[in-house]
From Swiss-Prot:
Cofactor binding, note field: May bind 1 zinc ion per subunit.
UniProt-listed PANTHER family: CHLOROPLAST PROTEIN-TRANSPORTING ATPASE, SECA INNER MEMBRANE COMPONENT OF SEC PROTEIN SECRETION SYSTEM
Name of the gene encoding the protein in the UniProt record: secA
Keywords attached to this entry: ATP-binding, Cell membrane, Cytoplasm, Membrane, Metal-binding, Nucleotide-binding, Protein transport, Translocase, Translocation, Transport, Zinc
Name of this protein: Protein translocase subunit SecA
Compartments where found: Cell membrane; Cytoplasm
Superkingdom in the source lineage: Bacteria
Any single GO CC term annotated in Swiss-Prot or TrEMBL for this entry: cytosol
Species per Swiss-Prot/TrEMBL record: Lactococcus lactis subsp. cremoris (strain SK11)
Stated role: Part of the Sec protein translocase complex. Interacts with the SecYEG preprotein conducting channel. Has a central role in coupling the hydrolysis of ATP to the transfer of proteins into and across the cell membrane, serving as an ATP-driven molecular motor driving the stepwise translocation of polypeptide chains across the membrane.
Alphabetized Gene3D superfamilies for the sequence: Helical scaffold and wing domains of SecA (1.10.3060.10), P-loop containing nucleotide triphosphate hydrolases (3.40.50.300), SecA, preprotein cross-linking domain (3.90.1440.10)
Single Gene Ontology BP annotation: intracellular protein transmembrane transport
Protein's UniProt keywords contain Membrane: yes
Positions with a binding annotation for Zn(2+): 847, 849, 858-859
Length: 865
């Protein structure tokens, strides 16, 4: 291991030496650029673009382009990138991540690679964690890019498709990661090329890259439609759960105590019923066996109710706003996530727990993981001050290297060892005493908490101590920038949950660095608990000591903190026993404790990485399917050629499947088998008068296929004759194909989503769930392709084509919307019209639509009460 570490350090040194040389090359242009007039400097942009058009690469232009942007920044922004910022910019251009400490000017660093890559005209996406930062950075840096002759756009959730398209067509586009991903999904749900907003993905530069590519990667981006409501079952399961005896996650000291109705695994945060709990469930729901196959749906509701009541914690995992809406709290930033909902019914279970209106369950219509979205960019890079702890993940998932960049000035912040107390009460008393001591000296203080309830508890204690302060948590995040901007003023006390205002610098006010005692100089950061991720702790520390300013950091811990309870070892418990003997106020400073905490954090980080990797592994299974379907959709939307050859292939394969299926089920020489085949053909492809039993009788399978195909070609030609105009024919072909593909694709990914839940249980049978998922999804994909071709054939053959005017009137209405929850209907139903009767059909009879499925498994799902 030491050899590996030594090698990594040597590689970093070698890379820094190379970057240093390149930065000096950029600086060698400084005098030349300084002597240019504004007009001459601005003229450099079209000149560089022309050189690219003539064949020079971006790498060829790097030194000069960086120097142009650097000089322009001095004239427009009054800021001149330092040597280390040039080094960081080169790393960004290379598609990697420079690790730059807080306050080292990452936003200014990004201007140089953004300018260089925007010269290609292929688009640069600057990605931020929220819309406030996207708007702020676009406004501030957009002034520089516009001065240099580049166009700058801002992509927000509230913008219309036209406004989004305009933003994406700019040289540089600012956006959040979620909005980029959702726009990609929406683009692959529209039915007309004019409704698409994104261009091909070229270069993304991600600010706070660890937050977006790591922390947010556990949650896939999903566009949903409404599914049927099951509110009564959620309330019933919640009523049952509230009768159970056991511990909540936040107070649990062990997984299980004798007599409990459920047990919690503290490390994995999972929950299950004990034998006592199962007995109670069977009595409550009046069933014989809770885990019988016929009760699978019920166990799903019970499992969610257990998680909602005993694992998901109010004001930590979620909060309820004034509109009685349950909002998820991002565990890494402390911000709420409006518009995002827990999947698989968990959100509805929390709504039942909190006795607020239950929103309908959703049906997945389109989804993608953050990882697979960003891996589609030709080049991906990002900036952060805390990425080294996740270096393996960046390398394995994104093929990105982390390069630590030296600070412009030496770090002067004093980082004190952690202080460990036996109880929460003793810890918070020590925290308040420290705040009083520092506040009396006029030192600005930032107090970091992990949960909203902790921030409110400290706030209450500060009110009692008559210390004025500000609270920044998920409940008042809208004042974030204003609160953080004032947090460096003399005497300011600010409590922040997790986020500590990432993206907004805390600038020190007058007199703050002048104190005689170094302990009271600069901003004091007080951590009230270690986060499960070392990066979040480092981000909190990094709020102090920016650009060589003095500062101090101190973490206060308790053996009753959640992290210690989840991963505390026997050796720590021995400390606890000794400390209780010596009194509640006893405090430990120990290297062993610090190492134990870091070891616990590494284990949690490892678990989280495994979780993100598993999300990606599942999404990788359908990635190829998604790319094929989306590519084919785009071909259909963009083509100006008649699609008859494509349709003929679908017709032929559908006929082959129908004949082969009947041949497998019986003998084609048998009259009953031929009659069944004839009925299927008449139901799905041809009018009754177009084909008769006598024509099929006695033919071989291949001869039957040829005969039916000839008649289908004839029927298709007569259908197209009703649309004499080739443009109308293409419009009709496109409408049918897109409607069928979209319906089947959304059904397919929703089925995959449900199947994923079930294959997880197969791990208990020593089967690899990922392998099972791969095999099942491949079969389901092939079935979906068959269903698409069958349905396209049926609609093309059986549709009652309406007059051209009807189609012409409907075309302008084929649009999608920017509102996530409204994306449900993307196909123009009115251009295809056919009545099929579903009356008096038995559950096990063949479906009248001709799919070959039983009625209960096809249209019977919606027609059987």
């Amino acid at each position: 291991m030491p050899n590996i570490i030594r090698k990594l350090v040597e590689n970093d040194k070698k890379e820094l030496k190379k970057l240093n040389k390149m930065a000096l090359q950029v600086e060698s242009f400084a005098d030349e650029m300084e002597h240019l007039t504004d007009e001459q400097l601005k003229a450099k942009t079209p000149e560089l673009k022309e050189r690219i058009a003539k064949g020079e690469s971006l790498d060829d232009l790097l030194y000069e382009a960086f120097a142009v942007c650097r000089e322009a920044a001095r004239r427009v922004l009054g800021l001149y990138p330092f040597h280390v910022q040039i080094m960081g910019g080169i790393v960004l251009h290379n598609g990697d991540v420079p690790e730059m400490r807080t306050g080292e000017g990452k936003t200014l660093t990004a201007t140089m690679p953004v300018y260089l890559n925007a010269l290609s005209g292929k688009g640069v996406h600057v990605v931020t964690v929220n819309e406030y930062l996207a708007t702020r950075d676009m406004t501030e840096m957009g002034e520089l890019y516009s001065w240099l002759g580049l166009t700058v756009g801002l992509n927000l959730n509230s913008k219309s498709p036209e406004e989004k398209r305009e933003a994406y067509n700019c040289d540089i586009t600012y956006s959040t990661s979620a909005e980029l991903g959702f726009d990609y999904l929406r683009d692959n749900m529209v039915t007309r090329a004019v409704d698409m907003v994104q261009k091909p993905l070229n270069y993304a530069l991600v600010d706070e890259v660890d937050s977006i590519l790591v922390d947010e990667a556990r949650t896939p981006l999903i566009i949903s439609g409404q599914a049927e409501s099951s509110s009564a079952l959620y309330y019933r399961a919640d009523q049952f759960t509230k009768t159970l005896k056991g511990q909540n996650l936040n107070v649990a000291t062990s997984d299980y105590e004798e007599g409990d109705d459920y047990k919690i695994d503290l490390q994995s945060k999972t929950i299950s019923l004990t034998e006592e709990g199962i007995d109670k469930a069977e009595k409550f729901f009046q069933i014989e066996n809770l885990y019988d196959m016929e009760n699978v749906a019920l166990t799903h509701f019970v499992d969610n109710a257990l998680r909602a009541n005993f694992i998901m914690l109010h004001d930590i995992d979620y909060m309820v706003d004034e509109n009685q809406e349950v909002l998820i709290i991002d565990q890494f930033t402390g911000r709420t996530m409006p518009g995002r909902r827990y999947s698989d019914g968990l959100h509805q279970a929390i709504e039942a727990k909190e006795a607020v209106p239950i929103q309908d369950e959703s049906k997945t219509m389109a989804s993608i993981t953050i990882q697979n979205y960003f891996r589609m960019y030709k080049k991906l890079s990002g900036m952060t001050g805390t990425a080294k702890t996740e270096e393996e993940e960046f390398r394995e998932i994104y093929n990105i290297q982390i390069t630590p960049i030296p600070t412009n000035r030496p770090v002067q912040r004093l980082d004190h060892p952690d202080l460990l107390y036996p109880t929460l009460e003793a810890k918070f008393k020590a925290v308040i005493d420290d705040i009083k001591r520092r506040h009396a000296e006029g030192q600005p203080i930032l107090i970091g908490t992990v949960a909203v309830e902790t921030s409110e508890l400290i706030s209450k204690k500060l009110v009692e101590a008559k210390i004025p302060h500000e609270v920044l948590n998920a409940k008042n995040h809208f004042r974030e920038a204003q609160i953080i901007m004032n947090a460096g003023q003399q005497g300011a006390v600010t409590i922040a949950t997790n986020m500590a205002g990432r993206g907004t610098d805390i600038k020190l006010g007058p007199g703050v660095i002048d104190h005689a005692d170094p302990e009271f100089r600069g901003l004091a950061v007080i951590g009230t608990e270690r986060h499960e991720s070392r990066r979040i702790d480092n981000q909190l520390r990094g709020r102090s000591g920016r650009q060589g300013d003095p500062g101090v950091s101190q973490f206060y811990l308790s053996l009753e903190d959640e992290l210690m309870k989840r991963f505390g070892s026997e050796r720590v418990s021995a400390f606890l026993d000794r400390m209780r003997i010596s009194g509640e106020d006893a405090v430990i400073k120990s290297g062993l404790i610090t190492r134990q905490i870091e070891s616990s954090q590494k284990r949690v980080e490892g678990n989280n990485y495994d979780s993100r990797k598993q999300v990606l592994q599942y999404d990788d299974v359908i990635r190829e399917q998604r790319e094929v379907i989306y590519a084919q959709r785009q071909e259909v939307i963009l083509t100006k050629e008649d699609m008859t050859p494509v349709l003929m292939g679908m017709f032929k394969r559908t006929i082959d499947r129908q004949v082969d299926g009947h041949e497998l089920a019986g003998n084609l020489k048998d009259e009953e088998t031929v009659k069944d085949l004839l009925q299927t053909v008449q139901n799905t492809m041809l009018p009754e008068e177009a084909i008769e039993l006598s024509e099929l009788t006695g033919l071989s399978g291949q001869a039957m296929k040829d005969l039916i195909f000839d008649k289908v070609k004839s029927r298709y030609a007569s259908q197209m004759e009703k649309l004499a105009d080739p443009e109308r024919q293409l419009e009709f072909q496109r409408a049918v194909i897109l409607r069928v593909v979209d319906n089947n694709w959304s059904e397919h990914i929703d089925a995959l989503d449900q199947m994923r839940q079930s294959v997880g249980l197969r791990g208990y049978a020593q089967n690899n769930p990922i392998v099972e998922y791969q095999e099942e999804s491949y079969k389901m994909y092939n079935n979906m392709i068959g269903a698409i071709e069958f349905e396209v054939t049926r609609l093309m053959m059986k549709a009652q084509i309406q007059p051209q005017t009807a189609i012409r009137q409907e075309a302008p209405r084929m649009t999608t919307t920017a509102s996530q929850e409204n994306i449900t209907n993307v196909g123009p139903d009115t251009s295809v019209s056919e009545e099929i009767s579903f009356e008096n059909v038995g559950r096990n009879d063949p479906c009248p639509c001709g799919s070959g499925k039983k009625f209960k498994n096809c249209h019977g799902r919606t027609h059987i009460a």
